[in-house]
Regions:
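Cytoplasmic-entry segments and transmembrane alpha-helices of multi-pass inner-membrane transporters
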Residues: 28-61, 76, 84-90, 94
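C-terminal transmembrane helix and the adjacent membrane-cytosol boundary/short C-terminal tail
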Residues: 36, 93, 170-232, 236
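Transmembrane alpha-helices
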Residues: 78, 111-143, 166, 170, ...
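Short cytoplasmic-facing helical segments at TM-TM junctions of multi-pass membrane proteins
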Residues: 87-127
Length: 285
């Protein structure tokens, strides 16, 4: 039951991060392909962010974004941008200039050239970048447990702390399977969005009913998870809540649970448990 709940958290956090990275990264890649002077600066910034250790970046974000979901998603989005921006820029730059010239010759506007020629031709390489980002995001999101955002990383960190190999595997194996599943899902989406003439596999480019059903279920789960989060945070009647947090020490986790039980049993206050956090800075964040 715990693994299922943490897996669902991990899926929602990962999908949210990847969708946000695509919404941000693809337009940036398109823009820098048209504004040549900006491409070195933008790619340089993206490369620099990629070089920063993930734990250090997450720790840096805590004073500004607090703990929980927001800094975790923000961090993964930043790390996911480089493959998307770079692949988008490279794919558009790689289009034959004679094709663009021919499009201009028949009277197409710049926007028409972008949406009818450049983006369709660039889609295979753009989707390759998105698939890389999606798989990377699954691994990076395990660090979300460090700041109390949940996910499969909770099992991994708990297992490391208690030298429990089975618990580590209980978090690591579902994460690996999830990464493969997300890559497979992205491959199906690629079949759908890439024009058949460009993909080069006209006969093999058909999406089966089962694949469509899996995509529909994934979309429904993602929409439900995001909708539930938005409803609980912004729409539902707010309850009296207090957060009880602890470091990743056994004694502190026991004390944290004792305090949480004491508060809930003697008051009408709901306790938000954030145990086994990464350190003092995280707790006071």
């Amino acid at each position: 039951k715990q693994i299922s709940a943490l897996l669902l958290q991990h899926i929602n956090l990962t999908f949210l991060s990847v969708v946000a990275a695509v919404i941000i990264g693809v337009p940036i890649g398109i823009l820098i392909s048209h504004f040549k002077k900006a491409n070195k600066t933008v790619l340089g910034i993206a490369n620099t962010i990629q070089a920063i250790p993930s734990m250090a970046l997450l720790g840096f974000l805590i004073p500004f974004l607090g703990i929980g979901v927001v800094p975790s998603v923000f961090m993964v989005v930043l790390y996911s941008l480089l493959p998307i921006i770079k692949n988008t820029f490279t794919s558009i730059e790689g289009i034959n200039p004679q094709m663009i010239e021919a499009a201009e010759g028949i009277g197409l506007t710049k926007l028409q050239i972008l949406f009818k020629i450049q983006i369709p031709m660039a889609l295979p390489i753009i989707m390759a970048g998105i698939r890389i980002s999606a798989v990377t995001a699954v691994g990076l999101m395990t660090i979300a447990a460090f700041v109390g955002a949940g996910g499969l990383g909770f099992l991994v960190f708990s297992g490391i702390r208690t030298a429990n190999t089975n618990q580590i595997l209980a978090g690591a194996i579902p994460a690996c399977i999830l990464a493969l599943f997300i890559d497979w899902t992205a491959a199906i989406i690629e079949k759908i969005v890439v024009p058949k003439g460009i993909s080069g596999n006209i006969g093999k480019n058909k999406v089966t009913f089962l694949q469509k059903l899996v995509l529909l279920v994934c979309f429904a789960l993602f929409t439900f998870g995001i909708g539930k989060t938005i409803f609980e945070r912004y729409i539902a009647t707010p309850e009296k809540t207090v957060t009880v947090a602890s470091k990743d020490y056994t004694e502190q986790i026991i004390l944290g649970n004792m305090l949480a039980e004491l508060i809930e049993n003697n008051t009408d206050i709901k306790v938000n448990r954030k145990f086994a956090l990464g350190g003092t800075k995280v707790i006071f964040g």
